[in-house]
Amino acid sequence: QVASLVFESVPAERVIIMLRDDDGTDNMQIKVARTRGKLEPIDEVRISRTVMEEVLKNGQSVLTADAQHDPKYFSQTMALQGIRSVLAVPLSVDERTIFGLVYADSPTYEATFTEEHLNILTTLASVASIRVENASLMDARLERERMERELELATEIQQRFQPSAPPIVEGYQFQGISFSCYEI
């Protein structure tokens, strides 16, 4: 959905959405890679590492109207793919935790990106970030509920192993209580 909205709002030829791996490393996974009008195979996507690092490490959005002549962002990737204009914005819910990026580019001079395009992409990225965070919170909630059900079941099983009454031994009286040690 986000890629479609980007194509509707910005004159990009290609949109790529990347998210950090869940394993805590800085590895990025391409989640969406589309070229205007068709689905682009994920294993053939190449984007500028310089642009990616600027967004992910510094949290800064990138806008370059002519990447071929911009010394800060020009790279072999840009030259080989003939990329002229680039937009990239971070995906984050708070300013400190960047968990991905939205990248858009165009090979033509007719589709030069502007500050207005950057503002639009930033707004779309904010909405997408909130949706990703909500999905993550929902997954965590479902996992917590699953664990609670498993603990309840374990408590039931443990209670079934306990005798229903203390043993009767002449000359002795027994009393006892048993309850689960761990509860959330």
Please provide the spans of the model-predicted regions.
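Regulatory loop-to-helix N-cap segments in sensory/regulatory domains
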Residues: K38-V45, V93, D105-L124
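… and, occasionally, acidic/histidine-rich disordered N-termini of signaling adaptors
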Residues: L142-I184
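Short beta-strand-to-loop transition segments that serve as allosteric relay/switch motifs
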Residues: R34-R36, Q68, G100-A111, V132
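GAF sensory/regulatory domain recognition
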Residues: A3-F7, R14-D43, I47, M52, ...
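A short, aliphatic-rich beta-strand micro-motif
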Residues: R84-V93
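Signal-transmission/dimerization alpha-helices at domain junctions
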Residues: K57-L63, N119-E143
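Regulatory sensory and allosteric helical modules in signal-transduction proteins
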Residues: Q29-K31, K38-Q76, L87
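Short regulatory alpha-helical segment in sensory/regulatory domains of signaling proteins that mediates
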Residues: V2-P11, L19-D21, R36-G37, L56, ...
